[in-house]
Design a protein with these regions (language model features):
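ABC ATP-binding cassette signature C-motif
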Residues: 1-56, 102, 106-354
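Intracellular alpha-helical coupling/juxtamembrane segments of multi-pass membrane proteins
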Residues: 43-84, 90-97
Length: 354
């Protein structure tokens, strides 16, 4: 395309691969940056250093993301594997600290995980006359962060509902470990009273709330999700999509689970909140299974990928892979050939009874 394009987006993968200029609106000011998203991170980090300590937390977050951008694919994979080996160390550190600083999103540690987290064996599941999952097996290790990817309607949310017991399996076995405490963020974000303020929804009107195993000021906790000052008094019924997503994250993460099921938590989130959520997951001593279309998020955070690889003949086929999204895509091309990287229409197989 030879013309100019102005795109409003929070998709960092798109910004890094397509954008030549980035214009950021920050606290009433417009800051132009020449270059892609990686260049933006470098330039903004320098600007925040000049602005001083008041932006120290943001500068640290940008520095962490920039270090990841500069690392090689091999370095990223090594870091992902190191996380899986560090569960005991991270859990012990969380128990020693028992303090949360909620200027940024932080996820409270849950109970210690045992040797079994989640084991799936030959899962079979259909819905509305269609076969969605057929023969899926995987084992989720402690400290694993799984990115679940695939087009809408292929069974990602249905899989979550089978894990939490809202949907029965048609076949196979799904074993949830005895030490697992589930926290689930519903894609539909239902059950929120539209007449309450968002602070009341999170706090039940209490000045102090229990966040995992830590008691803390409720307004400070709510502020960590981007709701500052008067924003906390907004009625829940008038919130935008991104605001409702942040509110639901706040509600769920305060439960203190050690296995998080996050159904498209990255939808409608701004870049700063996305980065804050990524850092929180990377520091979290526990497991997370995340349905998302955000490729940057999948590259930076995921230790495993659960990918829908349906075909015309087998539209209910899934593939379990250890590694991030970039590694998975290379593996997919090696296994299935160059055409595997191209998107194709979704087809479904009708359920049949033997």
């Amino acid at each position: 395309y030879k013309g100019a394009v102005i795109a409003i987006t929070h998709d960092r993968y798109f910004l890094d691969h397509v954008a030549q200029w980035i214009a950021e609106v920050d606290r009433g000011h417009l800051y132009p940056y020449e270059g892609n998203y990686s260049t933006y991170l470098e330039t903004k980090e320098k600007r925040l250093e000049v602005q001083g300590k008041k932006d120290a937390k943001l500068a640290k977050r940008l520095k962490d993301e920039l270090e990841w951008v500069r690392s090689s694919a091999k370095g990223r994979q090594t870091k992902s594997k190191a996380r899986l080996a560090r569960y005991e160390e991270m859990a012990a550190e969380a128990e020693r600290t028992r303090k949360l600083d909620f200027e940024e999103i932080q996820i409270p540690p849950g109970p210690r995980l045992g040797s079994v987290v989640l084991e799936a064996t030959n899962l079979q599941k259909g819905f509305d006359g269609r076969s969605l999952i057929n023969g899926l097996s995987f084992t989720l290790p402690r400290n694993g962060i799984v990115g679940v990817i695939g087009p809408n309607g292929v069974g990602k949310t249905t899989l979550f509902k089978t894990i939490v017991g809202l949907e029965p399996l048609d076949g196979g076995e799904l074993k949830v470990g005895s030490t697992v405490k589930l926290s689930y963020v519903d894609q539909n974000r239902a059950g929120i009273d539209p007449n309450k303020t968002l602070w009341e929804v999170v706090s039940d009107g209490l000045d102090y709330i229990q966040v995992g195993n830590v008691e803390m000021p409720s307004r400070a906790y709510v502020a960590a999700f981007g709701f500052k000052g008067a924003d906390q008094q907004k009625p829940a019924g008038v919130l935008s999509g991104g605001e409702r997503n942040r509110l639901n994250l706040a509600l769920t993460l305060k439960q203190g689970g050690n296995l998080l099921l996050l159904d498209e938590p990255t939808n409608d989130l701004d870049v700063e909140t996305l980065s804050s959520l990524e850092n929180a997951l990377l520091a979290f001593p526990g497991c997370a299974v995340v349905i998302t279309h955000d490729r940057w998020f999948l590259d930076r955070v995921a230790t495993h990928i659960l990918a829908w690889e349906g075909t015309d003949e087998h539209p209910d086929n899934w593939y379990w892979f250890e590694g991030n999204f970039e590694s998975y895509e290379k593996n997919k091309v090696e296994r299935l050939g160059p055409d595997a990287a191209r998107p194709h229409a979704v087809t479904y197989r009708k359920l049949t009874r033997d």
